């Protein structure tokens, strides 16, 4: 089975580290990039065809995670989106963008495993 390329986009390095550690246990997902801003993520997405993007809803950038999802939804071969959020306030908008899931911090490891399965 070919591995799915993952990009981690979160403002907090500890959340990126937790995601990276959780994904080490998943044989078919390989983390190929990390970013802390939408701009960095877009640069990486221009060069690597990521299959999945784990992203913060609350980016300290020109756009938030939902707006970035809207931009990406217009791209050919857009990655699947898994939102990581501090609250449920943007969940409806995330699912309107056909997000795979909307996970709350602190991350529930069981829920995370169900999302990836």
What would you call each of these model-derived segments?
Residues 25, 42-117:
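CheY-like receiver
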Residues 1-3, 78:
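A structure-centric signal for secondary-structure junctions around beta-strands
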Residues 4-5, 11-33:
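Two-component/phosphorelay signaling modules centered on CheY-like receiver
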């Amino acid at each position: 089975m070919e591995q799915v390329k993952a990009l981690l986009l979160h403002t907090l390095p500890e959340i990126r580290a937790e995601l990276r550690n959780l994904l080490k246990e998943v044989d078919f997902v390989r983390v190929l990039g990390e970013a802390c801003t939408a701009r960095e993520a877009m640069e990486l997405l221009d060069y690597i065809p990521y299959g999945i993007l784990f992203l913060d809803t609350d980016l300290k950038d020109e756009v938030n995670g939902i707006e970035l999802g809207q931009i990406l939804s217009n791209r050919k071969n857009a990655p699947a989106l898994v939102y990581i959020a501090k609250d449920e306030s943007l969940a409806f908008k995330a699912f309107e963008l056909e997000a795979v899931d909307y996970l709350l911090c602190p991350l529930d490891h069981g829920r995370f495993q169900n999302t990836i399965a």
